[in-house]
Amino acid sequence: MEKIKMPHPIAELDGDEMTHVLWGKIKEQLILPFVELNTEYYDLGLPNRERTADQVTRDAAEAIHRLHIGVKCATITPNLQRQEEYGLSQLWKSPNATIRAALDGTVFRAPILISRVKPVVTSWKKPVTIARHAYGDLYKAVEYRVPGKGKAELVFTDENGVETSRQTVYQFSGPGVVQAMHNRDDSILSFARCCLSYGLSVGQDVWFSSKDTISKDYDQTFKLLFQNCLLYTSPS
């Protein structure tokens, strides 16, 4: 039987532990007998990320951007236990977060629909796809373990070095923790356009959810930019 040819390469991102083993078996048994596999290979296993100071992850992100498609196995985002287990020089960042930030992409989680797999909710006849913004927020958050009494503040200094805002986050009376997140208007607009374009391409309604009644600046910005994008792209 003649194998299917791949005229254009894709980025192949190998992973950690059992996903590395399973991906090898999938290729050996289900792909290579039928396809002339044409890939650019990147080993995103934790030992190789340590050896390359995580440069391999950045190279993989560039390859996906250049080739327009990549297949990635699951990877370990190390915690303190993994750092000790693997002898890591530092707690390397999540490869997924690094790749998403480099691509300024959107994560779509869509179900695989086949007749042999019955849905848990049998009355649902159409798929539900979850879209998640892939930039900023928790993945780019700055955190601090508060050792004791003190005041946490949110300060913004403009490009001229002028302090334009100072707000008290919390007056700590004892140990605690504080976290700061951010996002950018251009990235949120890109996310909105991506969601609307995806919905149109697959014929699915787009539902937006936020907590703008509580988060009157952060979530409200998402809501307003989504509204603006929808109004701008809607047919007259």
Put a short name on every predicted segment.
Residues 85-86, 131, 141-142, 153-154, ...:
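Flexible, glycine/proline-enriched loop segments at strand-loop-helix junctions
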